[in-house]
Amino acid sequence: MSGKASGWRRPRGVAEVSLQSRVGDVRFANPIMVASGVAGHGTELASYVDMANLGAMVVKSLSSFEWKGNPAPRLHPVTAGMMNAVGLQGPGILRWKAEELPDLLATGAKVVVSIWGRSLEEYAQAAAMLADLPEQVVAVEVNLSCPNLLGKGMFAQSADLAAEAIAVTAACNRPRWAKLTAAVTDLVSIATSVRDAGAAAVTLINTVPGLALDIETRRPQLGNGPGGLSGPAIHPVAVKAVWDVHAALPGLPIVGVGGVASAHDVVELMLAGASAVQIGTAVFASPKLPGVILRDFATWCGRHHVISVDQLVGAAHERAAATDRPGQKDSQ
């Protein structure tokens, strides 16, 4: 099987499958990736997963400067998910290149670097620092959807600012994926804006803004106050975001992320329009999960006679067009 999962043996009755996927011009062995922020800078997973066998590893978001992040506590479990307010802690790109990247490259993983900034100038500086990276670093995910403006807003909530941030990051000399938020009134217009500014793909979605309170102390559970909700609770939100953007912009590659914990979730996002899928919060509970999902996904494809995973991308839209149910206006 082309691009097969490590340790995967094709069961009897399961068809030969090509797992190779593509996000724009970048090809991957398979569509299974680890999302930014759940495995540090990547090598932390090396003892649990054959990282060279995954589609890609997305590193924790980096800036052009060292950043200490938010006060503790930074994580809090909630029903069907987790709240976090880590605050983009990181060593800065120069230290990461010197201290973390060599070990990550040694695992054989394809690497996607996530960057952030508090201003357009800082996005541009971060991108320029990545221009000389080796070919194993295949793309740059421009994180526009954390509260990283000085006023704690998001670049991704403004079509104009999001487009400007993509435009100023061209110096990275790699395809740029714009990571967007579902916490907007018109996601399609923002996706259109970043595409027109040069984004090769969009990553949908980031965490959903939320707040958890301690009912005894009457204070927020997180040191920063509000935070981002992740995990199973946001999966349907991610599917809807991918669905809407693919329906409006079928030529724009999408990387789906949000509440992925099984091969079922991967298939669902791909049917909605994603070309690749990232696994996030679920890795905290089960660091071996990316490998498990990859094997289960390969088996599912074989049993459903999916010869190439490209067949899955947006396939539910064809069925929906026939039934004319999904995609109708929400009931009032």
Range-by-range predicted roles:
Residues 1-15, 229-252, 261-332:
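Alpha/beta catalytic cores of nucleotide-metabolism and tRNA/nucleoside-modifying enzymes
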Residues 59-64, 139, 144-146, 201-211, ...:
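Glycine-rich phosphate-binding active-site loops on the catalytic face of alpha/beta enzymes
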Residues 82, 144-160, 190-252, 288:
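Glycine/Thr-rich beta-alpha phosphate-binding loop at enzyme active sites
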